C-alpha cells in the first residue's frame, strides 16, 4: 500500500496550482464555449504534465509522449504551419478583394505589436521581447513560429497567452471599442456593394500575396505560403474534397494535437514565475493596442472622408478570425439593430490575418541572425 502512495511525496503546491489553471481552461472551454478545440486539450494537458513524475513528459532517459509530440510538431514549427493550411482553406477573401482599401485597417491594427516590442525590451532581451510582442496579433500559430525561431525562453507562457487572448476576444475588445468611440460613431451605417470578384482574381490573389510577402519579408514565406496554399486549394475549383478536408478534418485534428502539445511547456517549475505574469500582462497590452490602433486609424480616416466609416471595423484588424468580425457586428447591432457592417468587418478581419503573418515575418527579419 505504501508503494501506491509514495509518489504523493513528490507533489508540491505549484503542481496543484497548475491543476487549477488546467481546470479553469477546461471550464472556459466547456461552460463558456471559448475556443474549446484549443483550451480543452491545453487544460487537460496542463494537468497531465503536472502530475508528479508524469510519464507524459520526458523523465531522465524515459521519453514522454507529449515531449515527443513537441519535438515532432512544435520544435520544427510543423503543427502551426499545417494548421495554416486549414485556416487558409477556411478564409474567403471575397470581401477584401471587393474592397481592397480594407487592407489598410489590417495593417494599422498591428500597431500594438511594435509598441509592445519597445515596452517589453525594457524587461527582456530583444528576442524574447519580439516573441512576446507578437501575442498582440491574436495569432497563435504565428506566435509559436516566431517564438520558436527566435529561441525564446518563454515559449510556454507565450503560447498560452496567445491562445487565451484569442479566446477572450468577445470579452476584451468591446470595452476598448466603446472607450474609443462615441455612440454616434458606433451607429454609422456603411453601404456595402458586392462587387463581383472573378475566379482568376481569387486564384491569383494567394500567389501574388506570397510573392510580395516573400520579397518584403523573406522570413515570412513559410507562414504566408502555407496560409495562401490553403486558400489556393479552396479557390482553384478542382480540389473541393481536399478543401473540405483541410477546413474540417485537418484543421481540427492538428488543433487538438497543438493544444495538448502546448501543455508540455506548462510544467509548474517553468510556468509559475513572475516572468510569466509579466508576459501575460505585456501580451494583453499588445492586444489592447492592436485593437486601439485599428479603431484610431479609422477615426483618423474619417477626418478626410465624405462617406464616414464606422470606426469599430478597425478593431477587426487583428488575426482572430472570424471572432473579431462577429464581435464588431454584435456591437453595431446592439447600438442600432438595423446596422449591418459584418461584410466590412470580415474584410478587415481577413486582412488582419495576412497583416499579422507579415508582421511576424518582419520581426523575424529584424531579429533572426
Report the location of each language-model feature:
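Alpha-helical transmembrane segments
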Residues: 153-171, 282-288, 313-314
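Alpha-helical membrane segments and immediately flanking helix-loop junctions
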Residues: 71-76, 85-90, 104-111, 115, ...
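Hydrophobic transmembrane alpha-helices of multi-pass solute/ion transporters
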Residues: 1-10, 31-32, 44-78, 232-255, ...
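Transmembrane helical segments that form the transport core of multi-pass membrane transport proteins
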Residues: 209-297
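Membrane-embedded hairpin module used as a gating/binding unit in multi-pass transport
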Residues: 164-238
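Interfacial helix-loop-helix linkers and transmembrane-helix boundary segments
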Residues: 31-39, 58-59, 66-70, 91-105, ...
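Structural signature of hydrophobic alpha-helical transmembrane segments
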Residues: 7-18, 67-83, 128-136, 218-228, ...
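Entry/N-cap segments of selected transmembrane alpha helices
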Residues: 96-116, 268-294, 345, 349
Amino acid at each position: 500500500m505504501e508503494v501506491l502512495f509514495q509518489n504523493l511525496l513528490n507533489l508540491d503546491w505549484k503542481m496543484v496550482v497548475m491543476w487549477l489553471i488546467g481546470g479553469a481552461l477546461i471550464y472556459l472551454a466547456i461552460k463558456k464555449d471559448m475556443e474549446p478545440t484549443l483550451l480543452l486539450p491545453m487544460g487537460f494537458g496542463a494537468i497531465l504534465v503536472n502530475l508528479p513524475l508524469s510519464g507524459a513528459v520526458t523523465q531522465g532517459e524515459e521519453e514522454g509522449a507529449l515531449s515527443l509530440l513537441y519535438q515532432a510538431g512544435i520544435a520544427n514549427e510543423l503543427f502551426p504551419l499545417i494548421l495554416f493550411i486549414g485556416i487558409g482553406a477556411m478564409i474567403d477573401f471575397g470581401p477584401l478583394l471587393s474592397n481592397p482599401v480594407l487592407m489598410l485597417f489590417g495593417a494599422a491594427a498591428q500597431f500594438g505589436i511594435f509598441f509592445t516590442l519597445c515596452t517589453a525590451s525594457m524587461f527582456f532581451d530583444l528576442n524574447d521581447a519580439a516573441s512576446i510582442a507578437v501575442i498582440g496579433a491574436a495569432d497563435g500559430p504565428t506566435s509559436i513560429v516566431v517564438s520558436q525561431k527566435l529561441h525564446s525562453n518563454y515559449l510556454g507562457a507565450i503560447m498560452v497567452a496567445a491562445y487565451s487572448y484569442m479566446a477572450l476576444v468577445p470579452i476584451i475588445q468591446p470595452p476598448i471599442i466603446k472607450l474609443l468611440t462615441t455612440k454616434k460613431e458606433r451607429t454609422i451605417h456603411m453601404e456595402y456593394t458586392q462587387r463581383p470578384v472573378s475566379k482568376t482574381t481569387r486564384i491569383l490573389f494567394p500567389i501574388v500575396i506570397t510573392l510580395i510577402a516573400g520579397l518584403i519579408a523573406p522570413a515570412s514565406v513559410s507562414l504566408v505560403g502555407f496560409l495562401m496554399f490553403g486558400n489556393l486549394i479552396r479557390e482553384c475549383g478542382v480540389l473541393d474534397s481536399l478543401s473540405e478536408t483541410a477546413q474540417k478534418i485537418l484543421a481540427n485534428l492538428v488543433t487538438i494535437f497543438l493544444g495538448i502539445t502546448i501543455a508540455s511547456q506548462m510544467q509548474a517549475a517553468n510556468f509559475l514565475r513572475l516572468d510569466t505574469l509579466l508576459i501575460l500582462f505585456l501580451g494583453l497590452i499588445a492586444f489592447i493596442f492592436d485593437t486601439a490602433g485599428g479603431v484610431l486609424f479609422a477615426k483618423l480616416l474619417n477626418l478626410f472622408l465624405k462617406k464616414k466609416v464606422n470606426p469599430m471595423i478597425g478593431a477587426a484588424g487583428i488575426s482572430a478570425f472570424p471572432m473579431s468580425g462577429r464581435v464588431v457586428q454584435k456591437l453595431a447591432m446592439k447600438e442600432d439593430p438595423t446596422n449591418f457592417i459584418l461584410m466590412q468587418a470580415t474584410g478587415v478581419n481577413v486582412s488582419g490575418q495576412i497583416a499579422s503573418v507579415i508582421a511576424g515575418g518582419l520581426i523575424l527579419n529584424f531579429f533572426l541572425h
